[in-house]
From Swiss-Prot:
SUPFAM superfamilies: EF-Tu/eEF-1alpha/eIF2-gamma C-terminal domain (SSF50465), P-loop containing nucleoside triphosphate hydrolases (SSF52540), Translation proteins (SSF50447). Residues 91-94 are annotated as: G3. This is Elongation factor 1-alpha. One of its GO terms (cellular component) is cytoplasm. GTP binds at residues 14-21, 91-95, 149-152. Residues 5-225 form the tr-type G domain. Disulfide bonds: none annotated. It comes from Methanococcus aeolicus (strain ATCC BAA-1280 / DSM 17508 / OCM 812 / Nankai-3). GO terms for molecular function: GTP binding; GTPase activity; translation elongation factor activity.
Length: 428
């Protein structure tokens, strides 16, 4: 059995017209991920429709239609192998759920690839590009690469490419605290397949790696085993002859049988008897492990989804109130003091009230634009004071980042995303 490659979750971000899906499609196609039979069939259809010469776009459209027809080739589609990693492509922003999933941990991206159109150097950066970068920065994604796409539309000009690199570096990346010197920029033409997987012969001036080689320069996610134990509860079962079995995913720290544990905000404690995953007993559970465990001294009625488990010497923080930095993504009107939407943090969903709007920030630079604003609207970034309407666990993002981020939902949509930068504990 060959050792499995580590999994790397990569978010592809950028303006919708920059050629994001073409870039993803090209990576999947040229790395041999899409079933050759499907490609053959689409090639045949292309030539029957007089589109011979195997047009890549036709394959991409064909895949899109397959999805619309409900054929399940979606999964294979979103994964490909590089030399070093099994790369999972995390759905890009634009999907409303992307933000919620990123924050609730369903699909934490380890790195991001920003896809830009080289022609933006002439027309200016798209606002969506700024928003996406600001968002992944807020969500704690620090590894970034940039694919400068559509090089075929500027005759593979080094000058145009450099102009785009300069504009991104000076007008965006530096402002958001990324150091452009540490970021790989790659000139690509995804439509024709230059520099995605196959090295291009059209840009002799570019000596650097292809996009897939750049993905291999990202660091694998580190397991935060050195942080205090935190495990949000996803569900609680009662199993005959065993007792209460909570299930969830360890976010930080390590949990072992025999450990004394505390659940907050429930305020109950117990002792771990056994830990299981896929019907096998485990000697310990580490970050990323989805496990069920049997706990002595805790009844099914005592704990619920949204409670967080920790060790007695460092219990999860129950917030009386907290200060947060948020970015408002979409809202039909405005947010004012007294607004009480639902906060989604780890597995908890709790209505929380905006007590103070302290500062409005420039979303591109983080600088203070206005003290004590009267309201916030879509596109604003701000520092606010929040009070949960019932007990909830949230941590300072500087101490335990995995439990410091949240999405704010209202009217069936994600209206804002943010992180807790200071918390006043009720239980410490």
């Amino acid at each position: 059995m060959a050792k499995e490659k580590p999994v790397l979750n990569v978010a592809f971000i950028g303006h919708v017209d920059a050629g994001k899906s073409t870039t993803v499609g090209r990576l999947l196609l040229d790395s041999g991920t899409i079933d050759p039979q499907i490609i053959e069939r689409l090639k045949r259809e292309a030539s029957e429709k007089g589109k011979a010469g195997f047009e890549f776009a036709y394959v991409m459209d064909g895949l899109k239609e397959e999805r619309e027809r409900g054929v399940t080739i979606d999964i294979a589609h979103k994964k490909f192998e590089s030399k070093k990693y099994d790369v999972t492509i995390v759905d890009c922003p634009g999907h409303r759920d992307f933000i919620k999933n990123m924050i609730t941990g369903a699909s934490q991206a380890d790195a991001a690839v920003l896809v830009c159109d080289v022609n933006d150097a002439k027309t200016g950066l798209q606002p969506q590009t700024r928003e996406h970068i600001f968002l992944i920065r807020t969500l704690g994604v620090n590894q970034l690469a940039v694919a400068i796409n559509k090089m075929d539309t500027v005759d593979y000009s080094e000058e145009e490419y450099k102009a785009m690199v300069d504009m991104l570096s000076n007008q965006l990346l530096k402002m958001l605290g990324y150091n452009p010197a540490n970021i790989h920029f790659v000139p690509v033409a995804s439509f024709v397949g230059d520099n995605n997987v196959k090295k291009s012969d059209k840009m002799p001036w570019y000596k650097g790696p292809t996009l897939v080689e750049v993905i291999d320069t990202f660091n694998p996610p580190e397991k935060p085993t050195n942080l205090p134990l935190r495990m949000p509860i996803q569900d609680v079962y009662t199993i005959t002859g065993v007792g209460t079995v909570p299930v969830g995913r360890v976010e930080t720290g390590v949990m072992k049988p025999g450990d004394k544990v505390v659940f907050e905000p429930a305020g109950v404690s117990g002792e771990i008897k056994t830990i299981e995953a896929h019907h096998e007993q485990l000697p310990k559970a580490e970050p990323g492990d989805n496990v069920g465990f049997n706990v002595r001294g805790v009844g099914k009625k005592d704990i619920k989804k949204g409670d967080v488990l920790g060790h007695p010497d460092n219990i999860p923080t129950v917030a009386e109130e907290f200060t947060a930095q948020i970015v408002v993504l979409q809202h039909p009107s405005v947010m004012t003091v007294g607004y009480t939407p639902v906060f989604h943090a780890h597995t908890a969903q709790v209505a929380c009230t905006f007590m103070e709007l302290q500062k409005k920030l420039n979303p591109a630079t983080g600088e203070v634009k206005e003290e004590n604003p009267d309201f916030l609207k879509a596109g604003d970034a701000a520092i606010v004071k929040i009070m949960p309407t019932k007990p909830m666990v949230i941590e300072n993002v500087k101490e335990i980042p995995q439990l410091g981020r949240f999405a704010i939902r209202d009217m069936g949509m994600t209206v804002a995303a943010g992180m807790c930068i200071d918390v006043k504990a009720k239980n410490k």
